[in-house]
């Protein structure tokens, strides 16, 4: 249904289908089972990313800036989405979720000078799903 709605509405969806270095490392062979859907997404004119990193949730909050910097330096060329759940937790946030420290660590990593400098030094281009969709429209299926 997720793929179907994305295609029908021409809304970009999270579809990793390139080299899948981190996606395979984190999710094993189940990533390969997505291939038929990825071909369908691309053929329908939607963007497909090269890789997906989801492992940062297990990083200790204090180590996130350094770990993210190392990850950025190790990325292969292409489009990689790195999932974070950045938040400035309120007083009640810990009552809603046990991940408030992790989310605060995500925010601190994403706004750190270390990560900002790494992005600049590695010539990493930050992008949005809208920009990916605009680029995809310029490419033939």
Labelled PLM ranges:
Residues 1-66, 73:
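Catalytic domains of cell-wall/extracellular-matrix polysaccharide-remodeling enzymes
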Residues 22, 90-91, 135-136:
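Flexible loop/turn segments at secondary-structure boundaries
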């Amino acid at each position: 249904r997720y793929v179907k709605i994305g295609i029908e509405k021409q809304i970009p969806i999270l579809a990793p289908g390139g080299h899948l270095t981190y996606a395979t490392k984190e999710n094993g062979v189940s990533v390969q089972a997505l291939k038929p859907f990825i071909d369908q997404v691309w053929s329908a004119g939607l963007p497909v990313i090269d890789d997906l990193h989801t492992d940062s949730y297990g990083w200790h909050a204090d180590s996130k800036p350094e770990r993210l910097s190392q990850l950025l330096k190790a990325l292969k060329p292409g489009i990689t989405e790195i999932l974070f759940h950045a938040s400035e937790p309120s007083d009640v946030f810990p009552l809603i979720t046990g991940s408030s420290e992790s989310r605060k660590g995500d925010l601190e990593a994403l706004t750190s000078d270390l990560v900002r400098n790494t992005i600049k030094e590695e010539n990493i281009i930050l992008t949005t799903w809208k920009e990916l969709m605009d680029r995809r429209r310029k490419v033939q299926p």
